Amino acid sequence: MKNEKINQLCVEVKAELEQNILPFWMQKMIDCEHGGFYGRITGKDVLEASASKGAILNARILWTFSAAYRLLHKEEYLETATRAKRYLIDHFYDTEFGGIYWELYCEGNPLDTKKQIYAIGFAIYGLSEYARATGDAEALDYACRLFEVIEKYSFDAEKNGYLEALTRDWRPIEDMRLSDKDENEKKTMNTHLHILEPYTNLYRVWKDERLKKQIVNLVNLFLEKILDTKTYHLNLFFEDDWTNKYQIVSYGHDIEASWLIHEAALVVGDLDLLKKVEPVIVKIAEAADDGLNPDVSMYYENFVCK
């Protein structure tokens, strides 16, 4: 009975993907005038063609259609993924200083040139998935370039971990926040999670020893610095020395981290690391259950103390 329900869910999810989600982006969001994809459409399907274009949106489109092509082998998915790859490299990539611009005008010129490490991580995620799906050398090359700039400019060799954001030319920046609701701290759980995720995917197509070392380091950072070992929820915001001043629970990030940490240990093939993380990720997943409602929806966050 359980397997039947899972199989039925798989059928429903695949249908939703192919009949609704992917066609939406291919039919409504391709910008034929300026290239790439439109940056905004309202909930009532009103296109805002002059809206700015964000790096995260473009990188996620790249990952999505690359993964769809890898699994479903449809040429239209490859065409859309290639469009996203081309636009990311030609417009979002900073040819002078390296890295990815945060935001572009609708025409494709830089609007906000800060280097948000979260966005660079998603660019690696999308490019590495395209390389995984197609064997494309250019996508892999740019993914590796982005790995190098994160390691050169964001990695804190003294106190460990990764800085949240920097200026275009990699100097300290006053406002490091990913969004207005976030705390303005130098290190965050969210960015570390979305460095771990793309680094893991990059390792699938680039068996580099330094990359592997940093993946293992990131997993250990989650276990030793980010995880609250009393509650098994993740702490969210930190000073550069890993001091945590907030008690905010993000249930969605808890469940996301539980499988991304496990996936990382599996992909690098470190059996000792796998034995270390497996009992912990179960406890993280169980802690995420605190946010479940009777209708199986989940609370967004719980501000225990801020």
Give the location of each predicted region.
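Glycan-recognition and catalytic cores of secretory/periplasmic carbohydrate-active enzymes
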Residues: M1-K306
